[in-house]
């Protein structure tokens, strides 16, 4: 097959009528794979077929010709289409679903077909296509007036948000938080690779992000004069993004989005800022290997409903700075812990289905019979929830009790209307219960009694004709018939009308049987039509109370999270933190909530104090001693407190922080073309440019990605900037022991260390925070534990003793104060009329001369004078010739 000629062509008279129809539809949807319904299959053609064959592992065949070449074709069975759609959606591919809407029996030429829906990664609502544990978000971004506008829509729940951020780093952080399934951006907007290379990234025409168009669209949908009621009328960039997003959602869903009831201003100023590096380093819901194992979410998530699990994930990624809301959540957890009142509530909540997404499908008119059945069973549990909440003294729980109100009329309606175990789809009927509709019951009775009638007719005709081989039957092609064997067919009565000849029998029809056939077949089709009409009526009736049902579903999700946090706090021995508006972090016997769960040995808890007099701790100690764990547990305790949860400690008092920053670990950014050190410096720059005195900063091993003195200088300067200018609460872990002298020079800075001890030629990590700097790093002992060959360890020990014997500017813990070390002084120029030898000379380098060598050669001197970044190609070639001449 010639792959160069299989691109989708333009329809012309050389194509069959069916293919012309397909090509017209495909021309309208060039960016989607088109699933074209033909009988029991969805067929794909041309490039779509080739792409599907590769992505879905289906067979690539051919059908007919275009421009003299075979047309590539692939197909998937209609009944299994959802599985294939799910796979494409996960790969970030959009699909246009084309259905037959005409009647083949009455249509001349190709059956009429039209696009019934467009399935995109960010707009799917079908249960089979979604991960119930994660939000499935459509997000749009744009840039206006030097601010990034961001809007998100959860099609399943109808949650629609808008907000703005000031810079690219904040944009990356928000995309990391939202984890969109599909991301829309203007064609001309330049974004970092970390965003543009995401699966589901779509470029849209710039005109789709026009502010005036967006405002008209949104005010028309919400039925308002302007957007001031949502508090976002001044967010030009945000509204522009929201307009593009909403238009795209309407276009793909082919319906009004009635479940999108409001636009929420998701104001970053009310939340703790977490950048992308912090979310990654703290492993909130994804570990560094890319899975959920051993994450904070995995430890906390014992939610009983899918929507509760999704809300808990959102809380972890959006800690709050509103002390009123946090105190309300704490009080609710405290009330639920009283007499273990969370237990009966959790037992009841287990019976509640994913109401958010069921209601989303209800609003989109795509709800299936089992959705309605689960909705009925779920809202039937609301009275029990009301009973459990009655009498619990908590303002937040009382508010939720009002939201999760009873719906007795809907429970009664759905209980009467639906079969006990309805089928998956309405197509074949069997959904509406007997006794709900008299007309439907009558039509069903005709079909149900057909079997009895045929038995009686067969007995009657055998007795009347005396033909022993006579029998009455039915098939889909020829309908009802009387069948008589060949040997007796000639004795058939004259009123028998021949219908079909078989090899060994003849089939007949009689006027009486034809009358019954018309009535029975008509009754079946009329029953299906009646049932479909009743089902649609149910959908409309439920949509009349959609807003109240959405509020109740939201209340159930929040109640689920609160009862889960109560259960976790009880089982994991968490304490209630004291929150206040001032500055300071006090943690007594703090623990890492995740590490504690995976250790076989008891976790060693540690204290922490940061306040107005002690704002920074310089942490030293051996690798594997627990420095990173101590730092991370501090951040996680603060984060848990600021979602309103209890924390893993014996006591905690916290002044709310506005941001949490982490510079921990090492990794490169191949897609962005950044080295490990460049990533480290970029993250450090973000901290130094954006941290405030109310921020919590964790910095681990700053400067290790470059030479010793470059790294030491950078780490030193970072400590000074954080202490003197930003005054942020900081945990600064380092192996540069020279930095432990800084507390003598900088106010509010103290040394602490995690200790270890040597025992029988091995090392024992104590994991306990102690005041003061560490005495040694134990690097060789850790290397030995890691399995480094003994001869290498021995050689390293010799090198270490030689290096330690060499004089340096400072030994550990003798950092000069207050004047900083001149790590490298320039050579002074000779004064006029004074011998050069009398000028100030450059002192010996304080860094040990590890590998003494001869003076540099002329070639080396020449090479050092060349900056390759500033050379033109011609200059580079000339430099090469010069070097050749020198050598």
UniProtKB/Swiss-Prot annotation:
Organism domain of life: Bacteria
Single Gene Ontology MF annotation: ATP binding
Pfam families according to UniProt: MutS_I, MutS_II, MutS_III, MutS_IV, MutS_V
Region annotated Disordered, chain positions: 828-853
GO cellular component: cytosol
Residues given in the record as ATP binding sites: 621-628
Annotated keywords: ATP-binding, DNA damage, DNA repair, DNA-binding, Nucleotide-binding
A GO biological-process term: mismatch repair
SMART domains: MUTSac (SM00534), MUTSd (SM00533)
Functional description taken from the UniProt entry: This protein is involved in the repair of mismatches in DNA. It is possible that it carries out the mismatch recognition step. This protein has a weak ATPase activity.
NCBIfam families for the chain: mutS1 (TIGR01070), PRK05399.1 (NF003810)
Similarity comment: Belongs to the DNA mismatch repair MutS family.
Protein name: DNA mismatch repair protein MutS
Gene field: mutS
